[in-house]
């Protein structure tokens, strides 16, 4: 079902999704109240939802759905600061993913983004929303050419030189990751290793996400900027639309934020972060791959393990989408498989 107050958006989304094999849009609605009436007749497998609508806003509608009958919801939001803040509230309330739409050139943009829309809806249909709904406590695919991390950071042999004893944590996640990261980071004490994070998310949204977490956590959380120090008690989140690399200068770690082609169709890419962590930190790192579709991060986690790092994959039961962790496990990149609730303890105890 598509719920959006724009007739143009509804028309284009229906056309794009109905053209995809295995997807059938059973209904559309201009606002949540109309959607509720239609859902009484035929409940959808996935809902594509705008967040700013008349009569009832999307967040209220989403909370109603998640409390009564948990259903995968994909947020379709405008690429603005206000849209980003509202979308963060939606993700906290149980939405599984977000796709963006501009204020201008809307029809062409949605048509050009057809592959992303279809992939996101397919992923949402597989999401473990019952697990997600139980966790809720608060009131992007790009180019067709699939690059590897080599386009950003060429592979090299050998382990990282042990020039420092400072420990770091590298975390990669995608679909369902906003809720998973909130659960992990809010459980951490103020004194913990420095953390670098890639969460697949559009540009402009990561700053709002980091700000929200910063207000909830004992540790500091911010959107990473070029040359930021990686310090104990602070987490840096890759900005949407840019890659994040871990670097080292003497005994200190810092991050590099840079442009470049999408890797595994993502920018930022988990593989890029993990490869840089393997190279810069070696055995002083802990790599964690969590819920998400696809295989981004699977190769990089294996590189971290081969460089001497401890590596962990989230288990299937607690993953919203068991794609990235499953692939990492299959390739031998994870030396431990843990439920989400054990991740914070792993960060604190394994890196002491």
From Swiss-Prot:
InterPro entries: CheB-like, CheB_C, CheY-like_superfamily, Sig_transdc_resp-reg_Me-estase, Sig_transdc_resp-reg_receiver. The modification 4-aspartylphosphate is found at residue 50. One of its GO terms (biological process) is chemotaxis. It holds the Pfam family Response_reg. Phosphorylated by CheA. Phosphorylation of the N-terminal regulatory domain activates the methylesterase activity. Keywords: Chemotaxis, Cytoplasm, Hydrolase, Phosphoprotein. Its main location: cytoplasm. Residues 162-352 form the CheB-type methylesterase domain. The keyword Hydrolase applies. The active site is at 174, 200, 296. Belongs to the CheB family. HAMAP family: CheB_chemtxs (MF_00099). This is Protein-glutamate methylesterase/protein-glutamine glutaminase 2. It comes from Xanthomonas axonopodis pv. citri (strain 306).
């Amino acid at each position: 079902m598509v719920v959006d107050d724009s007739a143009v958006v509804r028309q284009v989304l229906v056309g794009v999704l109905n053209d995809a094999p295995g997807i059938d849009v059973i209904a559309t609605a201009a606002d949540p109240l109309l959607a509720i009436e239609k859902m009484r007749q035929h409940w959808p497998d996935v809902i594509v939802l705008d967040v700013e609508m008349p009569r009832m806003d999307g967040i209220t509608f989403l909370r109603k759905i998640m409390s009564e009958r948990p259903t995968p919801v994909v947020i379709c939001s405008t690429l603005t600061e206000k849209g980003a803040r509202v979308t963060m509230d939606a993700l906290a309330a149980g939405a599984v993913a977000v796709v963006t739409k501009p204020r201008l050139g809307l029809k062409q943009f949605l048509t050009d983004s057809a592959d992303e829309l279809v992939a996101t809806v397919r992923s949402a249909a597989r999401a473990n929303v019952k697990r997600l709904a139980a966790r809720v406590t608060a009131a992007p695919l790009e180019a067709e050419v699939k690059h590897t991390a080599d386009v950003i950071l060429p592979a090299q042999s050998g382990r990282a030189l042990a020039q420092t004893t400072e420990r770091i944590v590298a975390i990669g996640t995608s679909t369902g990751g906003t809720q998973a990261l909130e659960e992990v980071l809010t459980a951490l004490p103020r004194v913990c290793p420095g953390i670098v994070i890639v969460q697949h998310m559009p540009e402009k949204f990561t700053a709002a996400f980091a700000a929200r977490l910063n207000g909830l956590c004992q540790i500091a959380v911010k959107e990473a900027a070029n040359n930021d120090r990686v310090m104990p008690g602070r987490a840096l989140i890759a900005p949407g639309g840019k890659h994040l690399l871990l670097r080292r200068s003497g005994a200190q770690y810092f991050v590099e934020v840079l442009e470049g082609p999408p890797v595994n169709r993502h920018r930022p890419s988990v593989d890029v972060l993990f490869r840089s962590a393997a190279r810069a930190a070696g055995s002083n790192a802990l790599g964690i791959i969590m819920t998400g579709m696809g295989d981004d991060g699977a190769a990089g986690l294996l590189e971290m393990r081969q460089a001497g790092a401890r590596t962990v994959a989230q288990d299937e039961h607690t993953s919203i989408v068991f794609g990235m962790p499953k692939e990492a496990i299959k390739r031998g990149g994870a030396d431990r498989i843990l439920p989400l609730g054990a991740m914070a303890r792993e960060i604190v105890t394994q890196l002491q």
